[in-house]
């Protein structure tokens, strides 16, 4: 009677997938803001020269 095993694995997989998505989203946002501030810094440097 191992009927519930695959379902449990699917649920765990969904949770892990959601967690990875959130982590990826957070890293993406951080990287984007870093890149934007870096580009802004370069832009200011170019304008000052």
From Swiss-Prot:
| Topology within the bilayer | Single-pass membrane protein
**Residues annotated as transmembrane:** 20-42
Q: Where in the cell is it found?
A: Membrane
Species of provenance = Dictyostelium discoideum
Predominantly, its location class is: membrane
Keyword terms, alphabetized: Membrane, Transmembrane, Transmembrane helix
Cellular component GO terms held in the UniProt record: membrane
| Descriptive protein name | Uncharacterized transmembrane protein DDB_G0290911
| Lineage top rank: taxon | Eukaryota
């Amino acid at each position: 009677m191992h009927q519930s095993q695959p379902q449990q694995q699917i649920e765990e997989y969904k949770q892990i997938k959601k967690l990875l998505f959130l982590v990826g989203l957070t890293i993406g946002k951080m990287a984007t803001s870093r890149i934007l501030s870096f580009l802004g810094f370069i832009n200011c440097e170019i304008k000052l020269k």
